[in-house]
Amino acid sequence: MDSRLALATEEPIKKDSLKKYKILCVVLLALLVIVSLGLGLGLGLRKPEEQGSCRKKCFDSSHRGLEGCRCDSGCTGRGDCCWDFEDTCVKSTQIWTCNLFRCGENRLETALCSCADDCLQRKDCCADYKTVCQGESPWVTEACASSQEPQCPPGFDLPPVILFSMDGFRAEYLQTWSTLLPNINKLKTCGIHSKYMRAMYPTKTFPNHYTIVTGLYPESHGIIDNNMYDVHLNKNFSLSSVEKSNPAWWSGQPIWLTAMYQGLKAACYYWPGSDVAVNGSFPTIYRNYSNSVPYERRITTLLQWLDLPKADRPSFYTIYVEEPDSAGHSSGPVSAGVIKALQSVDNAFGMLMEGLKQRNLHNCVNIIVLADHGMDQTSCDRVEYMTDYFPKINFYMYQGPAPRIRTRNIPQDFFTFNSEEIVRNLSCRKPDQHFKPYLTPDLPKRLHYAKNVRIDKAHLMVDRQWLAFRSKGSSNCGGGTHGYNNEFKSMEAIFLAHGPSFIEKTVIEPFENIEVYNLLCDLLHIEPAPNNGTHGSLNHLLKTPFYKPSHAGELSTPADCGFTTPLPTDPLDCSCPALQNTPGLEEQANQRLNLSEGEVAATVKANLPFGRPRVMQKNGDHCLLYHRDYISGYGKAMKMPMWSSYTVLKPGDTSSLPPTVPDCLRADVRVAPSESQKCSFYLADKNITHGFLYPAIKGTNESRYDALITSNLVPMYKEFKKMWDYFHEVLLIKYAIERNGLNVVSGPIFDYNYDGHFDAPDEITQYVAGTDVPIPTHYFVVLTSCKDQTHTPDSCPGWLDVLPFIVPHRPTNIESCSENKTEDLWVEERFQAHAARVRDVELLTGLDFYQEKAQPVSQILQLKTYLPTFETII
């Protein structure tokens, strides 16, 4: 068939079909319009009463205004409920908010909260009643309030304090997701917030919550982990056991008891320890923990406590929510689950602020929102198994990101278990090993994690996002977790605060959560119990600080070590051929130790720009030894300097170290021989040699002899001295260039009982062989520079910057796996691992720094509690 013919015959058929389709569409459209108009007109003409709405008629048995339907409690059984009965009368009792349908409702006795007209008088309104039903603007949209005085209703003489914990809310969440969290973001905008708050190690829930309310390190308050064993109790503690309610585990004085002991009342809607009879007492009001109670119930109950009569009303409140921690564990920190959890806690916080505003308390209450720790991603591909290191596992291991190892056979073998062998067998086993084993006394001092029998001696510091397990399949490994090194950025927690006592619209520098307890006491105008915080270090958060700190008074003033003779009465088995082989040179060198008053003033100005360290030890017999390039505080009993101080300016382009002077040591003629070390002390001990506390890294060759004297000697393990020398010869110069000069204070530390405080003489257990010269457990170095680096440290008009280190003094460098490595590959990392606060140095040495710096004491305390960090990855 011809194709043109086929096309011609098909064309009329297509046109007929199209015409029918158009007609059908028009007819259907017309019918749709007619039906719509009919329904609209019919419903519009129907009277409102005939619709049978239950609005304002819920459970009313009179049936007034209802035709053909009912709103009483029996309508469901009869099947004659009005169309909106379920939404208006049933679901309204199951929500915590008002809506336009609920406003003015009949009082629903089973409702969670009320939107009835009399709810304000009855004090049972939903938190948003005034916003929804009376047209007030919500708290979240209002401008930031500003006032020097509390805006409190009658009966609130002291602003209440609310401590709100959001478990596992890491600081980065607030930066990343703040636009999704309108309520918390408003608090951040109007109040104060820190870049982060540092959790204590291990970064776990119970240890950190209890630290926040006691101001104590976990080693001090006893809750050293979520799981632990106490050999004296012979019991195990866990979050799922009844033992967690045994007061024997809980030491210290939580803030609710501090408040109660001083005449205030306290109420806790959950907080680790609040449902335990610590010291025999519970908070005034508390609830036994249950994670099934909705956040809205917790918020509503706290608001009801604020409604109590003045005589019964608490001054301090805690509230705790489990998110976003729970979502972080199950989904990991970067997940939709965490975002949803963050929004749920933001809604809960918004509900609290709406409820406070409804009571006119939103600018009266001092509220702190914080977290206990952060969260990090984990994976089953990033797990270290002990079965890869031991042929047979014959020990018990607390697994995860902060593992501890102890004997299985408890209590019999608890104290005889060979932790040293465990640590030795786990040290430097693989080039890509993702943990470092430590005996707890050797852990970085900034962790304060050693002095408690519940802290097992063998400990692993695990790399970020890695886990350590006993064997494969022994625990869950996916999702997220926490517990890691508290310097990891992923472990950083939030801190926000708002209220009449706090400054406004300010970002503050990071601080540690041990400081929160003292802050809470200041807000409540009460005296804190002894704690590990530094009282006054957070005064800059407050408009009018309650506590005014002052410098500590010196307990031992320096004695005189005067120059009496240019030649020693006893050479102390020392020799310096370069001086002694030429008549008069040794006497000439010793005369340099006899400084005039003007020379003393000049060296003090240059080398002690912030004042000499004060000695806080009783019977700390010492004297000051002045030199042109350094000054020492010489400890007579220990026969070595307690500290040396000197300033290293930024070197010029052509500067170099003075040449070394080999085999040269001489007696310091200013110190009695009986109070001096002999050069022969180090001949018998092959593992120990002498080091110089002041390393003579500046000045002329002539001034270098000022350092080669017995009063500058300190005992050092030979392997440690390699690291010490590299630090002073290379890193110190590097830091001086970076910071435009440094003031350096260094010295020995004795902490044989590893309690974080200086030892009494009878606690020191190791000495240079055959002598009474004690061997330090650590050495400290405090580097101070000017924050404004256009100034040098000896002429700094403003804030200072500090970089302190407390380095364990050990016979080997196995911590750094340094074998076959040059110092440039490991020394700086080793020092950074042992960075500390100035306050840590003070506690370990009995010294007190910066007393002559012209700055308010509270600002000096900020400096002393600052911890340098070197982590940049989250």
Swiss-Prot record:
Glycosylated residues, chain numbering: N236, N279, N288, N425, N532, N594, N687, N701, N820
Disulphides: C54-C58, C54-C71, C58-C89, C69-C71, C69-C82, C75-C81, C82-C89, C98-C115, C103-C133, C113-C126, C119-C125, C144-C190, C152-C364, C380-C477, C428-C817, C561-C623, C574-C679, C576-C664, C786-C796
InterPro entries: Alkaline_phosphatase_core_sf, DNA/RNA_non-sp_Endonuclease_sf, Endo_G_ENPP1-like_dom, ENPP1-3/EXOG-like_nuc-like, His-Me_finger_sf, Phosphodiest/P_Trfase, Somatomedin_B-like_dom_sf, Somatomedin_B_dom
Annotated tissue distribution: Detected at the tip of villi in the small intestine. Detected on basophils and mast cells (at protein level). Detected in the epithelial layer of the small intestine; expression is higher in the proximal part and lower in the distal part of the small intestine.
Residue span of region Nuclease: 581-874
Keywords assigned: ATP-binding, Calcium, Cell membrane, Disulfide bond, Glycoprotein, Hydrolase, Membrane, Metal-binding, Multifunctional enzyme, Nucleotide-binding, Repeat, Secreted, Signal-anchor, Transmembrane, Transmembrane helix, Zinc
Predominant location: membrane
The keyword Calcium is assigned to this record: yes
Keyword Transport attached: no
Domain SMB: 51-93, 94-138
Disruption phenotype: Mice appear healthy, and have normal numbers of peripheral lymphocytes, eosinophils and neutrophils. Basophil numbers are normal in bone marrow, but are markedly increased in peripheral blood and spleen. Likewise, mutant mice have an increased number of mast cells in the small and large intestine. Both mast cells and basophils show increased proliferation in response to extracellular ATP. Mutant mice display normal immediate reaction to allergens, but strongly increased chronic allergic inflammation in skin, intestine and lung that lead to severe tissue damage.
Quaternary data: Monomer and homodimer.
Entry protein name: Ectonucleotide pyrophosphatase/phosphodiesterase family member 3
Protein's gene: Enpp3
